[in-house]
Amino acid sequence: MLHLNIIKVKTPEEMGKAAADEFEAVICRKPACVMGLATGSTPLPLYRELIAREQAGKLDFSRVRSANLDEYKGLAPDHPQSYRRFMQENLFDHISIKPENTIVPDGLADDIPSMCRAYERKIEDWGGVDIQLLGIGHDGHIGFNEPCDHFPVMTHEVKLTDMTREANKRFFTSINEVPTAAITMGIGTVMAAKKIVMIITGADKAEILHKVFFGPVTPEVPGSILQFHHDVTLICDEAAAARMPQ
């Protein structure tokens, strides 16, 4: 049964502050918590706010652990478009989190299934994800879990759809440079998080957002599985919320 808390905001800065409030509550309650993190432009105001709050003495990341949702296959950690580099430049390098307490899937792993199993074990050893940050793709994908005929459970390799590659080509010089595959947490891993915070902006996401939370639960819209999560907070702007209940 869906337990959805909707917070509507007007600006990216408001979204960052609202999302940071959710993370701050978890970190203050559990200083060694596990954050599930995401990349892209939407989380940037959140990451800026988290950095500012630690600098102001409101937060302490020294015991916090983090596990990222996904990584491109074939990109080295220092590649300009790797998600590891994104996290370093936009969050990790600016807070007190320990390097050994941050994990991102290894896009260069020789044995990807083995790496994926080790990734799951690490999250399990940490006690699971306490708060998971998510966005949503135009086709309803979460992480890189693309529409398909089943809900993938564990961390795994996935072939990226043309729609996803097209959406991400703005970060690369051309579509030919966009990787064709990625490693992503599975739907089961995401659903095991104790709390989920989804951040969404833009009128172009209004239709899929309504499908995710109020349409049929189907692997053809991977995010629709969130209807079965016990604690989801959706933070979105008015444009994205256009089709959500008032």
Regions found by a protein language model. Give the residues of each.
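ATP/nucleoside-binding phosphotransfer catalytic cores, i.e., glycine-rich phosphate-binding loops
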Residues: 188, 192-246
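A glycine- and small-aliphatic-rich helix-loop capping segment at beta-alpha/alpha-beta transitions
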Residues: 48-60, 83-85, 147-156, 217
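N-terminal glycine-/serine-/threonine-rich phosphate-binding loop
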Residues: 1-35
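Ligand-binding beta-strand-loop-alpha-helix segment within the catalytic cores
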Residues: 1-3, 59-132
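Short beta-strand segments
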Residues: 36-40, 68, 105-106, 133-136, ...
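Glycine-rich N-terminal segment of FAD-binding domains in flavoprotein oxidoreductases
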Residues: 29-55
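A glycine-rich beta-strand to alpha-helix segment
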Residues: 33, 42, 46, 122-149
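Class I SAM-dependent methyltransferase SAM-binding "motif I" and its flanking Rossmann-like core
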Residues: 143-187
